[in-house]
Every structure is written in C-alpha cells, then in structure tokens.
Amino acid sequence: MTNDALFPKVGVITDIRKDTPDVKTFRVVGLDGKKMFEHKPGQCAMLSMPGVGEALFSITSSPTNEKFMEFSIKKCGCVTDWLHSVEPGQKITVRGPYGNGFPVDTDFKGKNMLFIGGGIGLAPLRSVINYIRDHRADYGTVDIIYGSRSKDDLVDFKEIEEEWKNEPNFNV
C-alpha cells in the first residue's frame, strides 16, 4: 500500500445492479471516467460520503478490468442504507486499496482452487475468482461451493450461472 491510498479520490457511481433484495453492486469510476486505482485480488477500499459516514468494502471486480471497480454491498447500516438509496451519477469518495490481497501470482499458480462462501461472503472472493478466470491457463481446477438462505439471496447468481459455470474446469 502506498501513501496515495490514504488520500480520498472523488468517484462517480455509474451503474447500480440489484443482486438480491438487500444486496446491490455499485460500479464506480473516477471523475475522468477511468478506473480510480489499481488493486490486487482480495483488496478493499473505503467508500464515504461527507455527512453520512464511511465504510470499508471488498472490491469485487477483477484487477484485470481496466475500466471500473465494483463493490457488492449488503444493506445493513447507516452508510449502506444511504448507498442503497442513491442513483447512478452520485459522487462518492473512495480511498484505497487496502489489504495485502491474495497471493494469486505466487502461491496459487498451477494449483487447484477451492472457494467456499455464503451470502455476501462471496464478495471478497469474487475478485479472486474472476482474476483466475481471466488467467485461466495459469491455474488448475476451480471448485466453488456457495450457498445462501434461498435462491433469491444468491449474490451474483447471474454471473455464476452464465459465466462461471461455462468455464472449463470450473465447478459451481
């Protein structure tokens, strides 16, 4: 992490996707319309709005995506309630990236992968899974065990059904 991560940058929410009754995925870019900063799989960022508060969220988009960052956020508090009420075009402050991320380029290469997540717990794993999908030749079989209270509570279900299940050696 560089000191640059400590300084807030103004971003814009360009798209909001409702994944479940209480989870939305927010697509964020900088004021210049570009990805705000580089990140590693598994890192997070601080999202804030003056007068509302701030909270740390997993970056769910793959680091190989050069256009934007995404955050899948469950409605469960002051900041998340506010986020769930905004519309595309809303400006927001972003700081990061934070955390070390996962050692995908060193410890994981050439190995079979097992991911286990439930509900919103898939969010921090999503960037890792998509990174591995983007670099498919570097990794072995990928097994994903994912559950939720009901099918309606499966975060990113469309991505799982339409993209991950169709990847070679991806078992969901």
Model-predicted regions and their roles:
Residues 4-5, 78-172:
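FNR/FR-type flavoprotein reductase catalytic core
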Residues 2-90, 148-150:
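Ferredoxin-reductase
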